[in-house]
Amino acid sequence: MKEQTEIGKIKEGRYIVIDEEPCKVVGLATSKPGKHGAAKARIDAVGIFDGVKRSIVSPVSAKTYVPVVERKSGQVISIAGDMAQLMDMKDYSNFEIAIPEDKKGTLEVGKEIMYIESMGKRKLD
């Protein structure tokens, strides 16, 4: 899910959709309006799920999309290799999620963990 907003209203640390991928804004620079042109904004962002750095240059008044990023909790049902099966604590739905390298030794069956969900994708927090 995503919402529409103006480029000028985006701040560092917020989220933005670039190339249909939700990204966290890490850098923001705006130029002054000139004699013949509008102010422009350069946004540098890093993908939430893939870690790829992306940037866009756009007029401040242009519209863009902002993803709805939700932090949820889930209970670990089982662990198989680098995948974990989780159950959402709100609606009790089951799903599989990849385990990042830094979390491999800390996950235990029955333990509650936080995860991020946005635009149909999930990632351990």
Curated annotation (Swiss-Prot):
<dbReference type="GO" id="GO:0045905">
    <property type="term" value="P:positive regulation of translational termination"/>
</dbReference>
<dbReference type="InterPro" id="IPR012340">
    <property type="entry name" value="NA-bd_OB-fold"/>
</dbReference>
<dbReference type="GO" id="GO:0045901">
    <property type="term" value="P:positive regulation of translational elongation"/>
</dbReference>
<feature type="modified residue" description="Hypusine">
    <location>
        <position position="35"/>
    </location>
</feature>
<dbReference type="Pfam" id="PF21485">
    <property type="entry name" value="IF5A-like_N"/>
</dbReference>
<dbReference type="InterPro" id="IPR019769">
    <property type="entry name" value="Trans_elong_IF5A_hypusine_site"/>
</dbReference>
<comment type="function">
    <text>Functions by promoting the formation of the first peptide bond.</text>
</comment>
<dbReference type="GO" id="GO:0003746">
    <property type="term" value="F:translation elongation factor activity"/>
</dbReference>
<dbReference type="InterPro" id="IPR001884">
    <property type="entry name" value="IF5A-like"/>
</dbReference>
<protein>
    <recommendedName>
        <fullName>Translation initiation factor 5A</fullName>
    </recommendedName>
</protein>
<keyword id="KW-0385">Hypusine</keyword>
<dbReference type="InterPro" id="IPR008991">
    <property type="entry name" value="Translation_prot_SH3-like_sf"/>
</dbReference>
<dbReference type="GO" id="GO:0005737">
    <property type="term" value="C:cytoplasm"/>
</dbReference>
<dbReference type="InterPro" id="IPR020189">
    <property type="entry name" value="Transl_elong_IF5A_C"/>
</dbReference>
<keyword id="KW-0648">Protein biosynthesis</keyword>
<dbReference type="InterPro" id="IPR014722">
    <property type="entry name" value="Rib_uL2_dom2"/>
</dbReference>
<keyword id="KW-0963">Cytoplasm</keyword>
<keyword id="KW-0396">Initiation factor</keyword>
<dbReference type="GO" id="GO:0043022">
    <property type="term" value="F:ribosome binding"/>
</dbReference>
<dbReference type="InterPro" id="IPR022847">
    <property type="entry name" value="Transl_elong_IF5A_arc"/>
</dbReference>
<dbReference type="GO" id="GO:0003723">
    <property type="term" value="F:RNA binding"/>
</dbReference>
<dbReference type="InterPro" id="IPR048670">
    <property type="entry name" value="IF5A-like_N"/>
</dbReference>
<comment type="similarity">
    <text>Belongs to the eIF-5A family.</text>
</comment>
<dbReference type="GO" id="GO:0003743">
    <property type="term" value="F:translation initiation factor activity"/>
</dbReference>
<dbReference type="Pfam" id="PF01287">
    <property type="entry name" value="eIF-5a"/>
</dbReference>
